Structures are given as C-alpha cells and as structure tokens.
C-alpha cells in the first residue's frame, strides 16, 4: 500500500464542488469557467484553484471546468507539474510557455470556439489581453464573486480540515507563549511559531507580530513583516497567527505582555476588545446580519477608541465575505458593504483590533468561529485572555 503524501478530499467532495460550479455555469449561461491562482498571501491566493483541484500550488495556475470534459489544471512552472500530480484530485497538465495561450487552445480543442468564458480571481492583464487578441471569439465575464459564494458554506470534510488547522494554530501560539522572552528579536518570535507549526505537521500560513512599549509609540496592529526590534520587559506583543491543514487555516489573535501586567490604558483597550468580541459572538447565528455585527462594534467608539484592522471577516480557505468594520471607522476603512446574512456552516473570524485614535497603542483579540444551527462555535482552545510571560 502506497503512502499518502498529502491530505486529500474524497472523490465525492470534489464531485460535489464540480457539480456546483457547473450549475453556476448553467445559471450564468457560461460555456467554461477558468479559475486563476497565484502565490500571493502565502499561497492563499490559490484558494479558488485549491477548491477545484485540491492542489495548493505556487506561481500562476489555471483550473478549467467545462460542461462535458473532466476538470483540468494547467500548472505554469514545468518543474511544479510532478508535485501537482501527487496532490491534485483532477487532471494536471503543464501550462506551457504561456498559460493564457495553452488554456485558450484547450478550450478550442474541446469545441468551444465561440465560448462565453467566466473567469475567477485576479487574472493578470497579460492573460486577459491575450485571450482578447488571440481568441476573439471568447466572451469574458468576471464571475469571481459568484464563484466564491460557493465556498462560503463549508462541507463536513472542510469543517474537519478547518478544525485541524485551528488545532495547529493553537499549538503554534502556545509555543510562542512558552518561548517568548526579553532579549529575542521580533523575527525570532516568528521562528518559534514556524518551528511548532511544521513539527506538528501544519503549514504556516501567516504570523503577524508587533512589539512595542506600553508607554506608546509601538505598532497598534500586528506587523505583516517581522522587524529586528529587540523584545524588552514591559512590551506588549500583538499577534495574528494562522496555521493550516493543507490550506485550511485557523486564525487567532491574543496580546502578550512581557514581564508586566497591562497598564491602565492597555487594560481599557483589552476590556473594550473583550466586550465588543463577546457582543459580536452573542449575535452570530443563521439569519443574523452584518447590521447585528455593526451594532456589537458600536461599543468601541462609545469607549473612546477606534479600530485599524477589520472587526469580522469570512474565512476558509483564505479571506471570504463579509468584511465588516465599525460604523465609526468608515472614514478610514471605507463605507460598509451591502447587507450580509449569515448562514449555517459559514466560518468567520471575530477580531476586534481596538486602538487609540492616534494609533500609538492597541490590542487585538480574535478567534475563528463556525456558524452552527443555534449560534457560533469557537474553533480554538486557547483561553480567552491576555497573556503575561516572564513576570
């Protein structure tokens, strides 16, 4: 019996997805859907391709679904093709010198000379122009939003994978708490997270960290690029950590205080984050709307603070709708989007990042949740608290 190298969804799960995509094609009058993925956001810009194929790739990849042919993925880099064949649940081919030309020729070869083509993702302008110039019979329609709505409701298999990603994330955060100490560099904190994640079998997705003195002047939100700053006693460290099970990540945020309890300002920031978090979690259930979430977030401004990062976002795999801030932060984050209604088996991250107006101080608290029939289940096991280490 051969060893299983990578996690795989069942054939039934992939067939369910392909059926849903083909129904989208019927509804929108499409002859084919071309799904684009890149290595952005630590490969989570491959989320749509992963949904079709189970391949978590790098570089530019295109998955093609038609009505009558089995789905196929075109992998841009020739040396990535063997690995794609080890993990993909669909046919894999090389994308050739130009994936745009290869995809176009494939569609012609299967009889779609004058095709209405739905594309998904941030397709490069070079690809789009190549389709226009070299395949003038194609009519192209952006169906990204419609396609991603298919991914909002998680299947039982997806929920199982997300639970595993959340457990990996908890493990990595616990390693950070155990290993963090004054004298380390910020980037060395990232090493603690990655080592724990990889040694447990998880894939590091992201670890955003920021450190600074409680007296102010540090970053109010976790940094996407870890600095060389030396950790000192009295610091606060804000965290955003995601570790995945073959792309399906958890996501959690907790502040860590080095050697000292939070001062009065940071205690008020924490108390506000916790209260807004609990208010939000309380309203989450099928039928709840983005207005309910905005109501929960009003307490942040009432306490004299604002937010930098979003208040709630959809998740799994990668970012999904909705993306919700607070009413009072619309001037800095843009206006609220259209009304969003939550449904059972959606996954969302509740993540209040409560900051001072001058953004010289802030904390972030967050967890990944599964919307259940009667509420919301937290998928993380790390206690709902701030952590003081080295005291």
Q: Where are these predicted regions, by residue range?
A:
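Active-site neighborhoods and metal-handling regions in enzymes and metal-associated proteins
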Residues: 1-391
